Amino acid sequence: MTLLSCITALTLGAVMIYPPLKLLNDVMLKHLEIEQDILLAQNINRAMELLARAIREAGYRVSQNSINEHDIQIKQDGLFKGSAAIALMQDLPKHLAYDCMGNVLSKERTRQQKTYQHFYLERSRNDLQSASLICQSLDRKGQLHQAELLNQVQYLRIHWVNPQAINATILTSKGPTGLIRVSLGVRRTSKTTKVNKLIEQVRWVAPRHI
């Protein structure tokens, strides 16, 4: 077999093998993206459930004589793209309960006999165009400590809304209305197309004790 015929055979072989190899690679990348989307959705659900649970329990009172009118504090115009933040307090519950880090709420983890949880966005150190969702709570010495719940966050919006409106209209008032709307936007970058995709989750949460 001459050199030319060898080169021709190799070229034809490469031409025949390349399409199925490329197809296999594309399928594997797509499968990886689907797995990453599922994992991201699970992480978003987990973060939103921790936030929703804290909102539902905020304002709990052991005694009717205690005051809870400031146990839910929503702040707007945060440092990252004007994002919102929410601070949540309650009396120490008699039943088993956990904070946003998975710690059991106890007397040591209180200030003035109230538990404390704070959710807000903090700009990412490695990516200035995104933020991390931060959860603050109290340690056993009653001091603040924090943990990251979610990365690549684009916004966190929290508002009191009108629970009697069909579309849960956002209200400008800061006072309790019985229903809070929380929306969280997270960026996901496709590894195949390199295109950014925004994944949003919205929840309406009713505080039980306010």
Question: Predicted segments — roles?
Answer:
Residues L39, D77-L79, L92, K141-I210:
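Short linear sequence signals and composition-biased patches located at protein termini or domain-edge surfaces
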Residues M1-Y60:
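Aliphatic-rich helix starts adjacent to a transmembrane/signal segment
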Residues E33, I55-S83:
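Short, glycine/small-hydrophobic-rich surface segments
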Residues D71-H159, L198:
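Surface-exposed loop/linker segments characteristic of extracytoplasmic
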